[in-house]
Regions:
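Short amphipathic alpha-helix adjacent to the substrate-entry channel of hydrolases
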Residues: 91-109, 377-396
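Short beta-strand/loop motif that positions the catalytic acidic residue
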Residues: 235-237, 523-525
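Alpha/beta-hydrolase active-site loop
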Residues: 122-143, 289-292, 410-431, 575-577
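N-terminal cap/lid segment of alpha/beta-hydrolase-fold proteins
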Residues: 22-71, 312-357
Length: 590
């Protein structure tokens, strides 16, 4: 039925040049702009600054089509500027994003909607009307411009991120009365990417969040309907943005409740307009390379039709060529292991020194295994240590005691004892190895991610009695990397999350003290993981409350062990670069 509607031929002259490239297309028939207000214009700040600009000549909102890609991939991206609904100011980033997308085969078009905010109406009303009309016109032009009517993506910044979210969640709610047959065309997007979305929470519906978006009464705005046409999303936000990142986490949570694939990327210490420098390469941070994450999301969703076959991670990092010296040592002195139990394995450390050392930092890594087993040769450990050795970093791998202890001890007690002692051992030997005892990080996956949270948040808590002078050395760390941590929330304390970790009463378990030595963290989690990514999100939110800025990335459609087999060009394939970007940003690897 949709395709039949798209064949309707319109008599308006403004629709006659749809097949041309690079032209400007007015949104409305002359005299039919809904809720027209003479004080509003439709122009970018670049246009407004041009000599001879006349407001009265710029009242018609419009689409601006970019030159078509040389090889189309069958999808279209509609780009939406921010500006507080007061202007359209993001034209520079619109142009940069359009160039990147065009190079990848996307047909690109930008929307310039009416600003400033309308009088007597919600601040978003004019933009929403123009946005719904714009999506209809884009869909109408699909056949002639060479893309699929059901492959229309939306990307917007700030207020444009708010408008992107509106269009992505509320297509079944009309923003205006129909003016012609164009309005019979559906106005839903097929994928949405809100960048530092503004006005998402009730403590900041028209400006920055008055209570940081974290108050008990700060709720997600009810303007977002999350109807049956709600599309997959990737959300991006800076951790110190006054337009609170909690808006993005709440949108993400709602999408999870609806089982709609989604990603969220949160950047430590970044405010509104977090963009960095994409030319920094491997010296860059996560926010420098945010557009790469957008492209990876599109690839993971197969929006470009080019999702390839998964590749085994171990085959990609099969060599120890970057490793120099290797050393293995037990964690406990003979006969002095705390709470020793005969059914458990013997814990040990392995030092992996790089051939060419480029940093004095040390990364401790260990695997998961449900506290039933663990192995430093598994895919959760070996590829990462090889990757970091290639970067010039010293890595220490740990085998902790498993299976779970008996006799009433918690599932993690033995492993926590081993980790605290391991950190002390590494710190005690760092200076001798010409490494920095105050630049030590820990990293674990799954149950090892739970153990990482223990080590990162609870170093002031004693896991065991002192048996020697090593116990006098602090066991805090400077950073932590939690990869799909398990057992984080109360609805999944001993297994997968029964409620998906989504409800408010699915709280962080009491295992984690979040004491005063808690360190910054990086979280990476599959969106489709049964050990819910909401555990990572809620821990990130708790760290933010404490003023501890951290990075977080979730990966659409990816489950537990997302990295084991991943398609090139996706976030599950490049995930280890997030570790290096985090260390770059925090300067731990210098």
């Amino acid at each position: 039925m949709i395709r039949n509607k798209l064949t309707v031929i319109f008599g308006f002259a403004l629709f006659s040049a749809l097949t041309c490239q690079g032209e400007r297309l007015p949104l409305w028939p002359e005299g039919k702009i809904p809720n027209f207000q003479p004080q509003q214009i439709a122009a970018t700040t670049k246009e407004v600054r041009q000599p001879g600009f006349k407001r009265e000549e710029h009242t018609m909102p419009y689409l601006q089509w970019f030159d078509a890609p040389s090889e189309k991939n069958g999808a279209c991206m509609l780009l939406i500027s921010g500006g507080g609904y007061k202007n359209c100011c993001d034209w520079r980033w619109i142009e940069k994003v359009a160039k990147r997308f065009t190079d990848l085969g996307y047909v690109c078009v930008s929307l310039t909607y009416r600003t400033p905010r309308p009088e007597g109406l919600p601040i978003y009303q004019s933009g929403w009307q123009d946005g719904q009309r714009a999506v209809r016109l884009v869909r109408q032009s699909a056949k002639e411009r060479g893309f699929d009517t059901e492959k229309i993506g939306l990307l917007g910044f700030s207020a444009g991120g708010h408008l992107t979210t509106l269009l992505g969640t509320s297509a079944l709610t009309p923003a205006y009365e129909p003016v012609d047959k164009v309005d019979e065309i559906p106005c839903h997007g097929n994928l949405a990417i809100p960048i530092y979305v503004a006005y998402a929470l009730t403590d900041g519906l028209t400006g920055p969040n008055t209570r940081g978006g974290d108050a008990v009464d700060a709720k997600l705005s009810d303007v977002f309907k999350f109807d049956a046409k709600t599309c997959p999303m990737a959300l991006f936000h800076g951790g110190t943005d006054p337009y609170s990142p909690q808006g993005s986490t709440e949108i993400y949570r709602q999408l999870r409740k609806m089982k709609i694939p989604a990603e969220i990327h949160l950047f430590a210490d970044r405010g509104h307009g977090f963009m960095g420098d994409p030319n920094k390469g491997e010296k860059g941070t996560a926010y420098d390379h945010w557009l790469d994450r957008v492209c990876e999301f599109l690839r993971q969703m197969n929006f470009d039709g080019r999702l390839g076959k998964p590749v085994d991670l171990m085959t990609r990092y099969a060599s120890d060529d970057a490793r120099g010296e290797y050393r293995k040592e037990p964690i406990w002195p003979n006969g002095r292991m705390q709470d020793a139990q005969p059914h458990q394995c013997q814990p040990y450390l392995e030092w992996h020194f790089p051939k060419e050392r480029k940093t004095k930092a040390i990364q401790i890594i260990y695997s998961g295994g449900g506290y039933g087993n663990n192995n430093p040769e598994w895919f959760e450990v070996t590829p990462v240590r090889r990757y970091l050795n290639e970067k010039g970093m010293t890595v220490v791998t740990m085998k902790y005691r498993t299976p779970r202890p008996k006799g009433g001890l918690a599932k993690h007690t033995s492993a926590w004892q081993d980790l605290q002692r391991a950190i002390r051992m590494v710190r005690s030997q760092a200076t001798k190895e010409e490494l920095d005892p105050n630049r030590i990080g820990i990293m674990g996956s799954s149950a090892g991610g739970h153990l990482t949270l223990m080590g990162a948040t609870s170093s002031k808590q004693k896991s065991s009695w002192a048996i020697d002078d090593l116990h006098k050395i602090p066991c805090n760390v400077q950073w932590a990397v939690a990869i799909y941590p398990a057992y984080v929330l109360t609805d999944g304390e001993n297994g997968q999350n029964s409620q998906g970790g989504n409800p408010n009463d699915a709280r962080i378990v009491s295992d984690f003290a979040f004491d005063l030595d808690t360190c910054p963290m990086l979280f990476i989690h599959g969106d489709a993981d049964g050990y819910s990514p909401m555990g990572s999100i809620k821990c990130w939110e708790q760290l933010r409350r404490m003023g501890i800025q951290s990075d977080l990335h979730t990966l659409a459609k990816r489950g537990h062990c997302f990295q084991r087999n991943a398609s090139p060009g996706t976030g599950s394939y490049t995930w280890m670069d997030r570790i290096w970007e985090f260390l770059n940003h925090k300067k731990f690897n210098q």
